[in-house]
Amino acid sequence: ITKMEISEKPKRPESNREYLTLDEVKRLMRTSCGNEMVKRAFLFSCFTGLRLSDIEALTWDRIRDSGKGMQVESTQIKTGKAVYVPLSSNALAQLPERGRGRVFHLPVRYTMGEILANWVKRAGITKHITYHCSRHTYATLLLTFGANLYTVSALLGHTDISTTQIYAKIVDENKRKTVDLIPDIGER
């Protein structure tokens, strides 16, 4: 078997990266979830970009004062890469009362998926939202509000900037849609 040249390898189709807008995040914050810990964990991920596996493993000793504010210092389960994520006031507001051991005590993933789907529906959001969409939400919100692509990439723990550029493309598409909201007035 011979190795394929990079140019010969079939390209994977870009997946649809569903995310929440800021208004949708606010709507979820105002809507009862049915499980307060699932609600807090999901919103915490919307404000930190942490994957579900990292949220499930997050312990209180990983949340520390850096001298410039609170941050999560953790090793990503998926990649083994160390990440340092400063915590905004929005993220801090989602933390449960400080204790020992794990920060978020969550149900099994299947149950959590059902809770999340029902919560999103109750909030009147018609998108197909999974837990991982919280990570997409974080990246998209940061870029929408002017964050540097390289900083977002570092916060997400991406090893390749092209992974983060997918979110920049989403933001660019939203800019086009927004500009097109002004109807053509027909006069030149």
Task: Report each predicted region and the residues it spans.
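Short, leucine-enriched amphipathic alpha-helices that occur as contiguous helical runs
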Residues: 25, 37-39, 109, 113, ...
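C-terminal catalytic core of tyrosine-transesterase DNA break-rejoin enzymes
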Residues: 43, 47, 53-54, 118, ...
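C-terminal secondary-structure termini that scaffold catalytic or DNA-interacting sites
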Residues: 182-188
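Catalytic tyrosine of NAD(P)H-dependent dehydrogenase/reductases that use a Tyr as the general acid/base
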Residues: 131-132
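Basic, Lys/Arg- and aromatic-enriched nucleic-acid-binding interface segment
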Residues: 2-52, 56, 78, 185
